[in-house]
Regions:
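N-terminal intrinsically disordered, cationic/polar leader segments
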Residues: 1-267
């Protein structure tokens, strides 16, 4: 029997003020999943003596987030995970997951809530320490109006898609990465966002497969601390509906999207 339990999506907004009047905001949802064999009796016998209530977990996350002295989502998850294991020895392992609520800075004290792409992270810890840390950026939407093609693909009686030598390309993308040493040298998801956008801008791709492969290789070249990268990219490119000189209209007649995945590991 394999068991786990925990608390999902605890919302918190952490604000830190500095002497120069500048404020930093770290807003996110945090989930905790507790793993271990010490909770069997709660399932098999209804014996809750070893059970840490999920409401207690919520309170722990909120209170211990105040004590965190860093400024990254990854660091906060590791801080909380270690705190759970130290405070509750009955927990054999914990998996902490965080999803950023993105606030973009407008001034030293003013921020705007953005609903687009956001950072994510997962940290798994056991008695031996940090087992794995995975960072990511999800819901990234990128549109490139020229500099992409899709030609020379397999054709048969079912194929109606025309070849396009130069096309707009509109993608939705999630990307995650793991570290060679999860304890140090973390890569910020905003930096990854900028690298992906730069690659999309200057690389002339023959397909989305070609594009994500180039993105992954550039990430591995830039950040030697990354051990593995995984992409999930959806093709949201619209179909042409009209053209008049330099003006073009595109539409989206079908809701189905192509899905392309890739995992690259450092050799």
């Amino acid at each position: 029997m394999r068991i786990s339990y925990g608390k999902l999506r605890v919302p918190l907004q952490r604000v830190v003020g500095h002497e120069d009047g500048r404020h930093d905001v770290l807003a996110c949802e945090i989930s905790v999943e507790v793993l271990g064999e010490n909770f069997h009796a709660a399932y098999t016998e209804g014996d809750n003596r070893e059970v840490v209530a999920t409401d207690t977990m919520k309170n722990f996350i909120l209170r211990e987030s105040l004590a965190y002295e860093g400024d990254t989502l990854e660091g906060l998850l590791v801080h909380l995970g270690r705190g759970f294991l130290e405070t509750y020895p009955v927990m054999e392992a914990v998996r902490m997951t965080g999803r950023e609520h993105r606030f973009d800075r407008l001034s030293d004290k003013l921020f705007t809530r953005e609903r687009g792409d956001h950072g994510v992270a997962t940290a798994e810890l056991g008695p031996e320490g940090l087992r794995e840390l995975r960072s990511g950026r999800e819901d990234l939407l990128l549109l490139k109006v020229t500099g992409s093609s899709f030609t020379r693909f397999a054709r048969d009686d079912y194929t109606t898609l025309p070849e396009r030598i130069d096309r707009p390309l509109y993608i939705r993308m999630d990307v995650w990465w793991r570290y060679v040493d999860p304890e140090r040298d973390h890569v910020g998801s905003l930096e990854v966002r900028e690298e992906l956008a730069s690659t999309f801008d200057d690389f002339v791709s023959e397909s989305i497969q070609h594009l994500v492969h180039e993105m992954g290789n550039r990430m591995l070249d830039r950040w030697p601390q990354i051990a593995e990268i995984r992409f999930e990219a959806e093709n949201h490119t619209r179909d042409p509906a009209g053209e008049d000189g330099s003006r073009r209209i595109y539409t989206d007649p079908f809701p189905a999207q192509g899905l392309i995945t890739l995992t690259l590991e450092r050799e």
